[in-house]
């Protein structure tokens, strides 16, 4: 990019331009820009891509539940950091049209960027209560958020005072009431319809057929095996009650991830029939926010997106008859999200963005874990979930829980 911003107004307007592009794409109307604090240079500007056309096809739009502008900017930075000789994250600011959600706030804190914000999101934003105390952020990270996040002042007739840290690009500055209102209203005009389309993008399991019974030459079956070569190798008789049958997959995947420099963790995804469709580790060696959960939810969404837009109608119909929204499946992680870290906040937020609304069956939870990180209790994990912004606690009702099968817990623990 060659654009430069001389002040907060110009920076937010660059991001606002991206939010307009997002609105025209019929996805969440949010945009962001990565600014070099010293020069004001716009290094990267991206908008939300949760819903996106597939090669001009509009048949199925749910592309990536984690493709919020801020998350994409973080991954863009780590992908291009060496090639472009980019400054350290602490010398850069992500300027966003909307208060980051839990996932994006966790991603930004993990990466170490400064953050400048225009509009508030009282439902899913990390500063939802507008008190600047960040109750959803792990306690030891709240002071970090208070020094690295900023909410620009707004001129008359809004008259909002600047609140935030001094390290953010264009600290202490204001933006126009016009720009502030644009960034808020354009998001509000899109949010409910996008959430509804996402949350309802799949059939009830009672109307599905088991993908395990697909013929070997099925395009859908091949796509699932391409995403995870061991798909269908394990079946849990009761998908919400996973047992020892998934222990080996979780452990082996975590070990492989760790050997290449990622965290020792893995996440399995079981479909409504109990089939193990995915079990992936993270890619933190590439980007610190590419955790195992992020990799799994993105892989499942991408596979559906490609298949549901396939040029062959019979493939599309078959995909729609065997694959559905992940709210009907079960995510099982080897280790729970760590409530003491921003990665933990990000993971719970990403789960909320994956569900994007109510879950039909809330018990047992469809967000489960086998083991707890050292020094973390089940109560700690639940406390973080209950402290998330209202969208996550009232609509999604995020409720991570430990698997109920003691044999699975013991087998994995004894194999470490």
Question: Where do the language-model regions lie?
Answer:
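Zinc-dependent deaminase catalytic domain
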Residues: 1-416
